[in-house]
């Protein structure tokens, strides 16, 4: 059973929602289109941020550790770490609601732990992302959730 579940509208509309649930140290992300032509868009799974595992050199009393805790509070704890960079992202917001690709976050510098973390924001919206987003908003693709059209995934 999930530890917690959150659903929120995706960017700039009320038809396509992002669903995030936490289970066993991971976040699972899916998109759901509501209203007519209800659809489910399976998403991704990502490990929940664990500072001890993901940043073992981070000193708990450092400025950066306090910055991470502040960011955790503002993001309601929905944090994940990028695989090949010292970045922590806010999982709640992404351009495609069924993907784990945060729009913003913070970047740590373990060599300068008494300096504040850096803020980053991604503005990547290539043609593929825009087309996929529009298709999802229009109810194309995905798995039907309407009883008369539902088929097992």
Where are these regions (language model features)?
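Alpha-helical transmembrane signal-anchor/signal-peptide segments
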Residues: 1-3
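Extracytosolic and intramembrane catalytic regions of membrane-associated proteins
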Residues: 14-153
């Amino acid at each position: 059973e999930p530890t917690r579940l959150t659903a929120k509208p995706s960017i700039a509309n009320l038809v396509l929602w992002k669903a995030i649930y936490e289970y066993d140290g991971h976040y699972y992300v899916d998109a759901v289109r509501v209203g007519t032509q209800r659809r489910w868009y399976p998403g991704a799974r990502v490990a929940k941020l664990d500072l001890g595992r993901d940043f073992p050199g981070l000193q708990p009393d450092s400025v950066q550790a306090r910055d991470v805790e502040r960011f955790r509070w503002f993001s309601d704890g929905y944090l994940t770490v990028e695989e090949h960079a010292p970045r922590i992202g806010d999982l709640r917001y992404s351009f495609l609601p069924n993907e784990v690709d945060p729009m913003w976050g913070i970047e740590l510098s373990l060599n300068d732990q008494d300096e504040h973390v850096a803020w980053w924001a991604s503005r990547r919206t290539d043609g593929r992302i825009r087309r996929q987003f529009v298709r999802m908003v229009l109810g194309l693709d995905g798995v039907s959730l309407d009883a008369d059209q539902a088929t097992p995934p």
